[in-house]
Amino acid sequence: LIFSELVLEITKGSDDPYSIAIINFEGPKNINNQISSIVSNDLNRTGEFRILRDNQLLSLPKNQEEINYDDFKLLNVDFIIMGATSQEDISNISVSYEIYSVNKKSKIRTSTIYGIPNRLRQLSHYISDGIYEEVTGIKGVASTRLLYVTEQMINSRSIFKLVVADADGENEQVLLQSREPIISPSWSPNSKEVAYVSFETGMAKVYIQNIASGSREIVLENNSQISSPSWSPNGNFLSLTLYQDGNAEIYILNLKNKN
């Protein structure tokens, strides 16, 4: 078997993207450089924005009073993003940001997000989503997470991994590693647990696993083929596909009594 890495590169987005000037935030330089970079990459990845950074701008205002809107109009900028970061101690950080409309010549949003330094990527993703929603009117997805299965050949044997990662592919967390297939991963409604089918014991079993603790339990096992666990909106039931006598049938599993 030959495996290759699949890379999808967005080379063209919207024909009329929003033009946004992201001015480096005030505060600790190392932190602000990371935030600006992550937010810029998040918005670029949507294909709906054209990002301008400090070295592309005619002026670098530090507050609303210093904004010369004509400087930004000359560059066809639609929105200006400014902000400031404050880190009072090693365990707490806050980021305030403002969005200005060049057309309206006014501030259209002010937000403050609190977090911890080692979750700076997640905090930055929330800022990206706030900007995206304010500009487009649609909720952003930068702060959401991906759930997927990978397969890798090691010593001529397949190794399967169930992985959770940020929407940009960073912060990968391996939930399960097995020499047997893992299929049909599914988020719980509160995003704290995942359901999936694993063949690690030689037969298909449905597991529910807590992402934070890693603890898991078997919620269904039988001699039939099982696939496609899917949560009910309230998180109390799973729908599953069972293959019996050559037929695929959909069943509902009550997670409280396992019936």
Predicted regions, residues:
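Short loop/turn segments that connect beta-strands within beta-propeller blades
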Residues: 103, 166-170, 210-214, 254-258
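Sec/Tat signal peptide C-region and signal peptidase I cleavage site
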Residues: 2-4
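A flexible loop/linker signature enriched in serine peptidases of the S9 family
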Residues: 139, 151-161, 177-180, 197-206, ...
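Hydrophobic beta-strand positions that form the internal "hydrophobic ladder"
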Residues: 146, 191-195, 235-239
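Short beta-strand->alpha-helix linker/helix-N-cap micro-motif
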Residues: 9-70, 81-84
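Amphipathic beta-strand/beta-sheet edge segments enriched in Tyr/Trp
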Residues: 6, 40, 63-130
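Residue-level detector of Asp-centered blade-edge/turn motifs that repeat once per structural unit
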Residues: 140-142, 189-190, 233-234
